[in-house]
Protein backbone atom coordinates (compact mmCIF):
# COMPACT_ATOMS: atom_id res chain seq x y z
CA UNK A 1 0.00 0.00 0.00
CA UNK A 2 1.23 3.49 -0.86
CA UNK A 3 2.27 5.57 2.15
CA UNK A 4 0.24 8.65 2.99
CA UNK A 5 3.22 10.84 2.18
CA UNK A 6 3.34 9.36 -1.31
CA UNK A 7 -0.43 9.83 -1.66
CA UNK A 8 -0.06 13.51 -0.76
CA UNK A 9 2.91 13.92 -3.09
CA UNK A 10 1.04 12.25 -5.96
CA UNK A 11 -2.03 14.44 -5.49
CA UNK A 12 0.07 17.59 -5.22
CA UNK A 13 2.13 16.67 -8.30
CA UNK A 14 -1.00 16.35 -10.45
CA UNK A 15 -2.59 19.54 -9.14
CA UNK A 16 -2.37 23.07 -10.40
CA UNK A 17 -1.78 25.38 -7.43
CA UNK A 18 -3.42 28.79 -7.74
CA UNK A 19 -2.97 31.89 -5.60
CA UNK A 20 -6.17 33.89 -6.00
CA UNK A 21 -6.12 37.51 -4.88
CA UNK A 22 -9.39 38.72 -3.34
CA UNK A 23 -10.43 41.79 -1.37
CA UNK A 24 -10.21 39.64 1.79
CA UNK A 25 -6.71 38.35 1.07
CA UNK A 26 -4.90 35.73 -0.94
CA UNK A 27 -6.51 32.30 -1.24
CA UNK A 28 -4.73 29.10 -2.24
CA UNK A 29 -6.65 26.67 -4.43
CA UNK A 30 -5.60 23.33 -5.89
CA UNK A 31 -7.32 22.12 -9.04
CA UNK A 32 -7.33 18.80 -10.85
CA UNK A 33 -8.69 18.28 -14.37
CA UNK A 34 -9.83 21.90 -14.60
CA UNK A 35 -11.18 21.50 -18.14
CA UNK A 36 -13.69 18.77 -17.20
CA UNK A 37 -16.74 21.01 -16.99
CA UNK A 38 -18.77 22.20 -14.00
CA UNK A 39 -16.56 22.72 -10.93
CA UNK A 40 -16.80 20.48 -7.89
CA UNK A 41 -15.56 22.60 -4.98
CA UNK A 42 -14.24 20.85 -1.86
CA UNK A 43 -14.16 22.64 1.50
CA UNK A 44 -12.08 20.92 4.18
CA UNK A 45 -12.57 20.65 7.92
CA UNK A 46 -11.28 22.68 10.85
CA UNK A 47 -7.53 22.89 11.46
CA UNK A 48 -7.07 21.34 8.03
CA UNK A 49 -6.17 22.14 4.45
CA UNK A 50 -6.82 20.72 0.98
CA UNK A 51 -5.13 17.49 2.09
CA UNK A 52 -8.23 16.49 4.06
CA UNK A 53 -9.27 15.32 0.57
CA UNK A 54 -6.01 13.57 -0.32
CA UNK A 55 -7.71 10.23 -1.01
CA UNK A 56 -10.50 11.79 -3.04
CA UNK A 57 -9.12 14.38 -5.42
CA UNK A 58 -7.50 12.04 -7.94
CA UNK A 59 -10.37 9.52 -8.21
CA UNK A 60 -12.95 12.32 -8.35
CA UNK A 61 -10.97 14.18 -11.00
CA UNK A 62 -11.26 11.23 -13.36
CA UNK A 63 -14.87 12.36 -13.86
CA UNK A 64 -15.04 15.95 -12.61
CA UNK A 65 -13.09 19.19 -12.42
CA UNK A 66 -12.08 19.24 -8.75
CA UNK A 67 -11.22 22.47 -6.93
CA UNK A 68 -10.00 22.27 -3.31
CA UNK A 69 -9.67 25.46 -1.28
CA UNK A 70 -7.39 26.12 1.65
CA UNK A 71 -9.98 27.88 3.81
CA UNK A 72 -9.06 31.52 4.53
CA UNK A 73 -7.17 31.47 7.82
CA UNK A 74 -6.21 27.81 7.39
CA UNK A 75 -3.61 26.04 5.29
CA UNK A 76 -1.72 28.43 3.03
CA UNK A 77 -4.54 30.96 2.58
CA UNK A 78 -4.34 34.34 4.28
CA UNK A 79 -6.50 35.16 7.29
CA UNK A 80 -9.12 37.81 6.45
CA UNK A 81 -9.08 40.78 8.82
CA UNK A 82 -11.40 40.12 11.76
CA UNK A 83 -12.27 36.54 10.75
CA UNK A 84 -12.67 34.16 13.68
CA UNK A 85 -15.28 31.53 12.78
CA UNK A 86 -17.32 30.04 9.95
CA UNK A 87 -19.84 32.89 9.80
CA UNK A 88 -17.01 35.31 9.00
CA UNK A 89 -15.97 33.41 5.88
CA UNK A 90 -18.99 33.65 3.58
CA UNK A 91 -17.79 36.86 1.93
CA UNK A 92 -14.20 35.66 1.40
CA UNK A 93 -15.49 32.35 0.03
CA UNK A 94 -17.85 34.15 -2.34
CA UNK A 95 -15.01 36.39 -3.48
CA UNK A 96 -12.86 33.39 -4.34
CA UNK A 97 -15.67 31.66 -6.21
CA UNK A 98 -16.52 34.79 -8.18
CA UNK A 99 -12.86 35.36 -9.09
CA UNK A 100 -12.54 31.81 -10.41
CA UNK A 101 -15.97 31.01 -11.82
CA UNK A 102 -17.65 34.41 -12.33
CA UNK A 103 -21.39 33.86 -11.90
CA UNK A 104 -21.36 30.13 -12.59
CA UNK A 105 -22.92 28.11 -9.75
CA UNK A 106 -20.79 25.22 -8.51
CA UNK A 107 -21.30 21.86 -6.87
CA UNK A 108 -20.02 22.30 -3.32
CA UNK A 109 -18.91 19.59 -0.90
CA UNK A 110 -18.32 20.73 2.67
CA UNK A 111 -16.69 18.52 5.28
CA UNK A 112 -17.26 19.38 8.96
CA UNK A 113 -16.23 23.05 9.38
CA UNK A 114 -16.32 23.35 5.59
CA UNK A 115 -19.95 22.26 5.67
CA UNK A 116 -20.73 25.13 8.04
CA UNK A 117 -19.12 27.52 5.56
CA UNK A 118 -21.17 26.02 2.73
CA UNK A 119 -24.35 26.34 4.77
CA UNK A 120 -23.79 30.04 5.42
CA UNK A 121 -22.94 30.69 1.77
CA UNK A 122 -26.00 28.77 0.53
CA UNK A 123 -28.19 30.96 2.73
CA UNK A 124 -26.55 34.28 1.96
CA UNK A 125 -25.54 33.93 -1.71
CA UNK A 126 -27.60 31.04 -2.99
CA UNK A 127 -26.90 31.75 -6.66
CA UNK A 128 -23.31 30.54 -6.22
CA UNK A 129 -24.25 26.94 -5.37
CA UNK A 130 -26.01 24.49 -7.69
CA UNK A 131 -25.85 21.38 -5.49
CA UNK A 132 -24.48 20.97 -1.97
CA UNK A 133 -23.17 17.90 -0.17
CA UNK A 134 -22.78 18.09 3.61
CA UNK A 135 -20.23 15.67 5.06
CA UNK A 136 -20.24 15.13 8.82
CA UNK A 137 -21.19 18.74 9.51
CA UNK A 138 -21.72 20.14 13.02
CA UNK A 139 -24.06 23.05 13.71
CA UNK A 140 -27.18 20.86 13.86
CA UNK A 141 -27.70 21.05 17.61
CA UNK A 142 -26.79 17.42 18.26
CA UNK A 143 -23.00 17.28 18.22
CA UNK A 144 -21.62 15.32 21.16
CA UNK A 145 -19.01 16.83 23.42
CA UNK A 146 -15.64 15.14 22.96
CA UNK A 147 -14.29 15.06 26.53
CA UNK A 148 -10.96 13.37 25.82
CA UNK A 149 -9.57 16.03 23.49
CA UNK A 150 -6.21 17.33 24.71
CA UNK A 151 -4.49 20.68 24.20
CA UNK A 152 -0.90 21.71 23.60
CA UNK A 153 1.47 23.45 25.99
CA UNK A 154 4.43 25.68 25.30
CA UNK A 155 7.69 23.77 25.35
CA UNK A 156 6.33 20.36 24.44
CA UNK A 157 8.67 18.00 22.65
CA UNK A 158 7.88 16.72 19.17
CA UNK A 159 7.07 13.31 20.65
CA UNK A 160 4.63 14.84 23.11
CA UNK A 161 2.92 16.81 20.34
CA UNK A 162 2.60 13.71 18.18
CA UNK A 163 1.03 11.83 21.09
CA UNK A 164 -1.60 14.55 21.46
CA UNK A 165 -2.31 14.56 17.73
CA UNK A 166 -2.81 10.81 17.87
CA UNK A 167 -5.16 11.14 20.84
CA UNK A 168 -7.21 13.89 19.22
CA UNK A 169 -7.44 12.20 15.82
CA UNK A 170 -8.77 9.07 17.49
CA UNK A 171 -11.13 11.07 19.70
CA UNK A 172 -12.92 12.93 16.92
CA UNK A 173 -11.66 12.27 13.39
CA UNK A 174 -10.75 8.61 12.91
CA UNK A 175 -12.63 5.53 14.13
CA UNK A 176 -10.03 2.84 13.37
CA UNK A 177 -6.69 3.52 15.04
CA UNK A 178 -4.97 1.48 12.32
CA UNK A 179 -5.65 4.43 10.01
CA UNK A 180 -3.36 6.66 12.08
CA UNK A 181 0.17 6.51 10.68
CA UNK A 182 3.31 8.57 11.36
CA UNK A 183 2.67 10.34 8.05
CA UNK A 184 -0.84 11.28 9.20
CA UNK A 185 0.52 12.69 12.46
CA UNK A 186 3.01 14.81 10.50
CA UNK A 187 0.23 16.02 8.20
CA UNK A 188 -1.92 16.91 11.21
CA UNK A 189 0.93 18.82 12.84
CA UNK A 190 1.56 20.80 9.66
CA UNK A 191 -2.14 21.66 9.36
CA UNK A 192 -2.66 22.57 13.02
CA UNK A 193 0.34 24.90 13.07
CA UNK A 194 -1.24 26.92 10.25
CA UNK A 195 -4.66 27.26 11.91
CA UNK A 196 -5.25 30.96 12.65
CA UNK A 197 -9.02 30.68 13.22
CA UNK A 198 -9.27 30.43 16.97
CA UNK A 199 -13.02 30.20 17.62
CA UNK A 200 -15.30 27.20 17.14
CA UNK A 201 -18.46 28.45 18.88
CA UNK A 202 -20.74 27.95 15.87
CA UNK A 203 -19.90 24.26 15.53
CA UNK A 204 -21.59 23.68 18.90
CA UNK A 205 -24.78 25.52 17.91
CA UNK A 206 -27.84 24.58 15.85
CA UNK A 207 -27.34 27.36 13.30
CA UNK A 208 -27.84 25.15 10.23
CA UNK A 209 -31.37 24.26 11.36
CA UNK A 210 -32.49 27.84 10.76
CA UNK A 211 -30.26 28.50 7.76
CA UNK A 212 -31.57 25.49 5.84
CA UNK A 213 -34.86 27.26 5.11
CA UNK A 214 -32.91 29.73 2.98
CA UNK A 215 -31.09 27.12 0.90
CA UNK A 216 -32.33 27.00 -2.69
CA UNK A 217 -30.03 24.24 -3.94
CA UNK A 218 -30.55 20.49 -3.70
CA UNK A 219 -28.79 18.99 -0.70
CA UNK A 220 -27.18 15.61 -0.02
CA UNK A 221 -25.64 14.24 3.17
CA UNK A 222 -22.81 11.75 3.62
CA UNK A 223 -21.85 10.64 7.13
CA UNK A 224 -19.65 7.99 8.67
CA UNK A 225 -21.55 5.45 10.74
CA UNK A 226 -19.08 5.88 13.61
CA UNK A 227 -18.92 9.69 13.57
CA UNK A 228 -17.95 10.60 17.14
CA UNK A 229 -19.94 13.84 16.93
CA UNK A 230 -23.19 11.96 16.35
CA UNK A 231 -22.86 8.76 18.36
CA UNK A 232 -26.39 7.67 19.22
CA UNK A 233 -28.10 10.44 17.23
CA UNK A 234 -27.13 9.91 13.59
CA UNK A 235 -30.59 8.55 12.77
CA UNK A 236 -32.15 11.88 13.72
CA UNK A 237 -30.36 13.95 11.10
CA UNK A 238 -32.60 13.38 8.04
CA UNK A 239 -35.61 14.63 10.01
CA UNK A 240 -33.68 17.63 11.29
CA UNK A 241 -32.77 18.51 7.70
CA UNK A 242 -36.38 18.29 6.51
CA UNK A 243 -36.45 22.05 5.98
CA UNK A 244 -34.18 21.85 2.94
CA UNK A 245 -34.24 19.96 -0.34
CA UNK A 246 -32.52 16.90 1.15
CA UNK A 247 -32.35 14.41 -1.70
CA UNK A 248 -30.22 11.67 -0.12
CA UNK A 249 -28.66 10.87 3.25
CA UNK A 250 -25.94 8.23 2.96
CA UNK A 251 -24.24 6.51 5.90
CA UNK A 252 -20.96 4.70 5.25
CA UNK A 253 -20.49 1.69 7.50
CA UNK A 254 -17.50 1.54 9.82
CA UNK A 255 -16.19 5.03 9.06
CA UNK A 256 -15.69 7.83 11.54
CA UNK A 257 -16.09 11.59 11.24
CA UNK A 258 -13.37 11.87 8.58
CA UNK A 259 -15.38 9.54 6.38
CA UNK A 260 -13.79 10.53 3.06
CA UNK A 261 -10.39 9.50 4.42
CA UNK A 262 -11.32 6.30 6.26
CA UNK A 263 -13.67 4.98 3.56
CA UNK A 264 -12.40 6.78 0.49
CA UNK A 265 -13.55 4.27 -2.15
CA UNK A 266 -17.12 4.13 -0.84
CA UNK A 267 -17.21 7.89 -0.36
CA UNK A 268 -15.94 8.66 -3.86
CA UNK A 269 -18.47 6.27 -5.40
CA UNK A 270 -21.39 7.82 -3.52
CA UNK A 271 -20.29 11.39 -4.16
CA UNK A 272 -20.01 10.90 -7.91
CA UNK A 273 -23.43 9.22 -7.91
CA UNK A 274 -24.96 12.18 -6.06
CA UNK A 275 -23.21 14.78 -8.20
CA UNK A 276 -23.22 13.40 -11.75
CA UNK A 277 -22.12 15.67 -14.57
CA UNK A 278 -25.13 17.51 -15.92
Spans of model-derived segments:
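Active-site loop/oxyanion-hole signature of alpha/beta-hydrolase fold enzymes
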Residues: 54, 67-109, 269
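Catalytic histidine-centered segment of alpha/beta-hydrolase-like enzymes
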Residues: 255-264, 268
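Flexible "cap/lid" loop of the alpha/beta hydrolase fold
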Residues: 119-123, 130-160
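Gly/Ala-rich beta-loop-alpha elbow adjacent to hydrolase catalytic centers
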Residues: 110, 114, 118
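Alpha/beta-hydrolase fold catalytic core
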Residues: 1-40, 61-64, 101-102, 170-171, ...
Amino acid sequence: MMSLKKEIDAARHKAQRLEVQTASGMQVWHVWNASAGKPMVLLHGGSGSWNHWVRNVLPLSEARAVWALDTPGLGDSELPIGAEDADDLSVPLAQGLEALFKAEPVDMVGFSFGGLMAGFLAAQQSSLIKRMVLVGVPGLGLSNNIPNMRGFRVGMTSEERMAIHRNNLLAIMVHDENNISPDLLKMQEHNVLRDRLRRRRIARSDVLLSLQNQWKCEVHGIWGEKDALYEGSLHLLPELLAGCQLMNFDIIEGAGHWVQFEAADAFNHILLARLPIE
